[in-house]
């Protein structure tokens, strides 16, 4: 039995499908408001038997519950996180992304579940001007570092603390993840905004990776026992304009034509 948090999310649904296709049994943490039907439709579309999915309803921030939830599992895939660039969500992100990871790590240590695959973010990696982003650049705070980046970096600290206390861990740091999902959540919201006629696009470029590739990496790297490692996941670097143009062309809607600086897009998205 393998335990998954965030299993109804963008990457989580692909990971659950990946595990089931590999013959695994999955215990899936969900909140009362989680959209179970969307995941079940996703699995059914791929011809996968959801009878090997055990639903576990509860709260990541409840330590006693988490100890009971993960008991008897051989590995934990921790994908649950809040992604937001709105200042009002900063405290909530820190609670879910950092504090819940601490609680999960403590629960694993207490009940003896040793293996943890943690989905982090490229945002938790450092930057050196003029150099490509890579796993060895230390994170540094600064005026342009988002609350989301801080929360993901601090969640990683909890994971590495778990390693020092006896867990086998690895982290994956994907770039912008794209895939089929809820258009109201996470990076999937980009598709919804373009479809609805978004007029702006960021200048510059970023790395992009498919959700199914991230899920596959979680599964394969865990099975290959790549413990103690950190992996940057990226498929290709593209300009924002080219990605938004491709979305618009596929939807057969006008392309976003007004360039704005990437740091301004948070305001644009909140107004759209």
Predicted regions and their residues:
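Substrate-positioning beta->alpha
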Residues: 154, 185-186, 202-222, 228-229
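Conserved Rossmann-fold NAD(P)-dependent oxidoreductase catalytic core, especially the SDR/UDP-sugar
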Residues: 90-91, 95-148, 170
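Mid/C-terminal beta-alpha module of Rossmann-like enzyme folds, strongest
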Residues: 217-272
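Glycine-rich "substrate-gating" loop/helix at the edge of Rossmann-like oxidoreductase active sites
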Residues: 144-147, 175-183, 200-212
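Conserved beta-loop-beta element that borders a ligand/cofactor-binding pocket
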Residues: 120, 157-180
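Conserved catalytic-site region of short-chain dehydrogenase/reductase
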Residues: 85, 122-131, 177-182
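NAD(P)H-binding glycine-rich loop region in Rossmannoid oxidoreductase-like domains
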Residues: 47-99
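N-terminal Rossmann NAD(P)H-binding glycine-rich loop of SDR-like oxidoreductase domains
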Residues: 2-22
């Amino acid at each position: 039995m393998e335990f998954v948090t965030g299993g109804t999310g963008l990457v989580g649904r692909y990971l659950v499908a990946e595990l089931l296709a590999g013959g695994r049994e999955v215990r899936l943490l969900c909140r009362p408001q989680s959209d179970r039907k969307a995941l079940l439709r996703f699995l059914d579309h791929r011809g996968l038997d959801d009878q090997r999915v055990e639903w576990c309803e509860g709260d990541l921030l409840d330590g006693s519950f988490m100890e009971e939830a993960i008991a008897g599992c051989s590995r934990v895939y921790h994908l649950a996180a809040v992604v937001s660039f709105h200042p009002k969500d900063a405290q909530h992100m820190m609670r879910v992304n950092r504090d819940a990871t601490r609680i999960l790590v403590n629960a694993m240590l207490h009940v003896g579940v040793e293996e943890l695959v943690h989905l982090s973010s490229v945002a938790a990696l450092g930057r050196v001007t003029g150099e490509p982003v890579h796993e060895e650049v230390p994170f540094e705070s600064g005026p342009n570092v988002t609350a989301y980046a801080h929360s993901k970096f601090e969640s990683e600290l909890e994971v590495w603390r778990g390693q020092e206390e006896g867990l086998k861990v690895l982290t994956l740091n994907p770039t912008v993840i794209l895939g089929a999902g809820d258009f109201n959540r996470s990076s999937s919201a980009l598709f919804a905004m373009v479809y609805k006629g978004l007029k702006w696009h960021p200048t510059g470029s970023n790395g992009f990776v498919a959700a199914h590739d991230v899920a596959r990496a979680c599964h394969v790297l865990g099975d290959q026992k790549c413990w103690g490692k950190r992996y940057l996941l990226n498929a290709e670097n593209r300009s924002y304009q080219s990605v938004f143009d491709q979305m618009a062309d596929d939807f057969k809607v006008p392309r976003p034509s007004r360039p704005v600086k990437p740091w301004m897009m948070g305001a644009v998205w909140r107004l759209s």
